Regions:
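C-terminal regulatory/interaction regions
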Residues: 2-26, 273-312
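Short, basic/low-complexity N-terminal boundary segments at the transition from targeting/disordered tails
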Residues: 15-41, 143-150
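Acidic/histidine-rich helix-loop elements
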Residues: 34-38, 73-77, 135-150, 215-227
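Conserved beta-strand hairpin/beta-sheet module of binuclear metal-dependent hydrolase folds
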Residues: 36-89, 93, 191-213
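Short, flexible loop segments at the rims of nucleotide/cofactor-binding pockets, characterized by
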Residues: 47-51, 74, 99-102, 223-228
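Divalent metal-coordination and catalytic microenvironments
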Residues: 48, 62, 72, 82, ...
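Metallo-beta-lactamase
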Residues: 68, 75-77, 158-161, 169-172, ...
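Active-site HxH/HxHxD metal-binding segment of metal-dependent hydrolases
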Residues: 77-79, 87-169, 266-267
Length: 312
């Protein structure tokens, strides 16, 4: 049996395809491993709240005398960066007692398994996202017709220790966080709120899960998942009701981490640039405007191609 074609041009074509396949696979593995993230200098935001994430995909450490809480695990490849940042600040990964997740996507849950293994911490995930996280990201209902892709782009599956509903409280000693399920980006997207004391000020921190409406999501019948439109509308209302002083997000660019970090150098109090109620409300307003515009567009043209064109 002849396995190599006789025609030279066909042999060349097969060779080119093989090389492209290797390159594309390598790039795909790198993208799903760390998404091109770079190490970012960790720092104190306010009180016992620290930034320990990468240059864009975020992770936050809340420290306490009875153990620490870590929000989000980034990509699989950013877990070592997070642990290095925690150590650089003088803390131990083994003192992290609770891992929290904003949502099930691989750029925020991908590193949870490694962080859990290193720390021994218990992982809390909302009921809406717990199955997807426990499966390494597979089966996310908010992915809609592209749900099948989640079975190929998977991350190491962590152990989900606790599943919670909206309003749940998570406590580690004096640290208390409230789970605000702000679904839409995913079915269990969770925005965490908690107080921090910075000097003589008590500040409310809100970590917004995500307000990004994915281009493949259908807000009209048939909805990507039943109730997604109502979920988005509830999320905007819920977030506005929270009296946030400091707001954070799953991506650093969304809340201006780098700009605020630079402003710390000249601020009277290094926490002051992060006290940004106006920016918080503006981010919600802009996200809702995008949602309303997309809803109106889908009501005019509900086709998948219409959604894809607008999402590009």
């Amino acid at each position: 049996m002849r396995l190599i074609p006789k025609r030279p041009w066909l042999r060349i074509l097969i060779g080119v395809v093989a090389v492209l396949a290797v390159v594309l696979f390598s790039n795909w593995r790198e993208a799903t491993n760390n998404g091109g993230q770079k190490y970012a200098e960790p720092f104190r935001i306010a009180g016992n709240l620290y930034y320990v994430g990468a240059n864009d995909v975020t992770s936050f450490l809340i420290t306490g005398p009875e153990g620490h809480v870590l929000i989000d695990g980034g990509y699989p490849g950013t877990a070592p960066m997070i642990m290095a940042s925690i150590a650089q600040l003088g803390f131990k990964i083994t003192d992290v007692k609770v891992l929290l997740n904003s949502h099930a996507h691989f750029d925020h849950a991908g590193g949870l398994a490694e962080l859990q293994k290193a720390s021994g911490a218990e992982l809390w995930v909302s009921e809406g996202d717990a199955d997807a996280v426990a499966a390494g990201g597979a089966g996310d209902p908010a992915a809609g017709i592209f749900r099948f892709i989640t079975y190929f782009v998977r991350y190491p599956a962590p152990r989900v220790d606790h599943r919670f509903k909206d309003g749940a409280k998570v406590r580690v000693g004096p640290i208390e966080l409230t789970a605000n399920v702000t679904a839409g980006h995913t079915r269990g997207c969770t925005s965490w709120s908690f107080p921090v004391r910075d000097g003589d000020r008590e500040l409310l921190v809100v970590h917004i899960c995500s307000l990004t409406l994915m281009g493949n999501q259908s807000l009209v019948e048939p909805e990507t998942y039943p109730g997604i439109r109502a979920d988005w509308e509830h999320s905007f209302e819920k977030l506005r009701s929270l009296p946030a002083d400091i707001w954070l997000a799953s991506h650093a660019r969304e809340f201006g981490r780098w700009r605020k970090f630079q402003q710390r150098a000249t601020a009277k109090n290094p926490a002051d640039p992060f006290i940004d109620r106006a920016g918080y409300l503006s981010a919600i307003d802009k996200a809702e405007e995008r949602f309303r515009n997309e809803l109106a567009a889908q009501q005019r043209d509900p086709s998948l191609m219409g959604r894809i064109r607008r999402g590009l």
